UniProtKB/Swiss-Prot annotation:
One of its GO terms (biological process) is tRNA wobble uridine modification. SUPFAM superfamilies: S-adenosyl-L-methionine-dependent methyltransferases. Pfam families: Methyltransf_9. Carboxy-S-adenosyl-L-methionine binds at residues 91, 105, 110, 130, 152-154, 196, 200, 315. It catalyses: carboxy-S-adenosyl-L-methionine + 5-hydroxyuridine(34) in tRNA = 5-carboxymethoxyuridine(34) in tRNA + S-adenosyl-L-homocysteine + H(+). This is tRNA U34 carboxymethyltransferase. HAMAP family: tRNA_carboxymethyltr_CmoB (MF_01590). It comes from the Bacteria. It comes from Psychromonas ingrahamii (strain DSM 17664 / CCUG 51855 / 37). Catalyzes carboxymethyl transfer from carboxy-S-adenosyl-L-methionine (Cx-SAM) to 5-hydroxyuridine (ho5U) to form 5-carboxymethoxyuridine (cmo5U) at position 34 in tRNAs. Its EC number is 2.5.1.-. The keyword tRNA processing applies. The keyword Transferase applies. GO terms for molecular function: methyltransferase activity; transferase activity, transferring alkyl or aryl (other than methyl) groups.
Length: 328
């Protein structure tokens, strides 16, 4: 199974130590329910990776780990075949020992859009909710974050993350836990909390915003990115069934409605930093994700609409601060 003992050792010495009251039991229960099935086969793939100590780790401008010269051509081909077993790769891209993992999403584009708007991450404790395979977590570390924790219940994302971490000399300041936000206690320990591409999957968006708030220190920063529609503060789309072929889509507010929701939950200095149409250059099928992608989700005769007739995907980036309680 995945070994979480290094994470326990790390947080025992930092501001997350109080999490040890509940976390080991949670993850022990998770392990007991994931002994069989696809996870076991993915872990066998992880165990086949060569042990290589690399001196080349680039996280500031991209996620590039290891050099192509550290492996023979045969070893490179074998590693590429192993990495392909974690198909589909959704978020990236990654370069591992010269192997370019061309993921479905150009997550680096999103990072480039949001980076100018957020507070510097240097020395910060960061939580990434719904982190996927962890691409943005590596970029957070590249910006100098002291400790980065990602949570995502997907077994595949966990194994993809562990694959990258294996070649990053088993980095001990970036960790992914297979949990949902609803499984976290009120830690109140992170300087920055990211939630990107999660809110529209929640039946109760207000509860999600409050759960994010509970993880922040007072004065901490929320970075929230979600699908939005046009309109004023009263505009909210509730898809009848699917949206862009996606199940489990509940609420798509306007950017102004989103701002109002976050303010209503008690955040301060709430602002919409960016609104961006998702284009097929940013989300597309590749050799590392051969399933349908954005092009297949849009009306072929009108790309401004989804196949269901709703407005095409548009994403807003919201930044807010958790209020500091006044001294009594």
């Amino acid at each position: 199974m995945i070994d979480f003992t290094n994470f326990y050792s790390s947080i025992a010495k930092n501001r997350l130590s109080h999490w040890l009251r509940t976390l080991p039991m949670q993850l022990h229960e998770w392990e007991n329910t994931h002994v069989h099935g696809q996870l076991a086969s993915w872990i066998r793939v992880l165990n086949k990776f060569p042990d290589i100590k690399t001196s080349h780790i680039e996280l500031k401008d991209r996620v590039e780990i290891g050099s192509a010269t550290e492996l023979s051509p045969g070893e490179t081909k074998k590693l590429e075949n192993l990495l392909q077993k974690f198909h589909p790769w959704r978020k990236g891209p990654f370069v591992i020992h010269g192997i370019h993992i061309d993921t479905e999403w150009r997550s680096d584009w999103k990072w480039d859009r949001l980076l100018p708007h957020i507070s510097p991450l240097k020395y910060r404790y960061v939580l990434d909710v719904g982190c996927g395979s962890g691409y943005h977590m590596w970029r957070m570390r590249g910006e100098g974050a002291e400790f980065v924790v990602g949570i995502d219940p997907s077994e595949l994302f966990l194994c993809q993350f562990e694959a990258v971490r294996h070649f990053a000399n088993k980095e001990q300041n970036v960790h992914l836990l297979p949990l949902g936000i609803q499984e976290l206690p009120k830690l109140g320990a992170f300087d920055t909390v990211f939630s990107m591409g999660v809110l529209y999957h929640r039946k109760s968006p207000m509860d999600h915003i409050t759960q994010l708030q509970d993880q922040l220190v007072e004065g901490g920063e929320l970075v929230l990115e979600t699908l939005v529609i046009g309109g004023d503060e009263n505009a909210v789309l509730v898809p009848q069934d699917r949206y862009a072929k996606m199940r489990n889509i509940w609420f798509l507010p306007s950017a102004q409605a989103l701002k109002l929701w976050v303010e209503k939950c008690g955040f301060e200095n709430v602002r919409i930093a960016d609104i961006n149409d998702t284009l097929t250059g940013e989300q597309r099928s590749t050799a590392w994700m051969t399933n349908e992608s954005l092009e297949d989700y849009l009306d072929p005769n009108d790309p401004s609409r989804t196949v269901e007739g709703y407005p095409a995907p548009k994403r807003a980036l919201l930044i807010a601060k958790k209020a500091i309680k006044a001294l009594s």
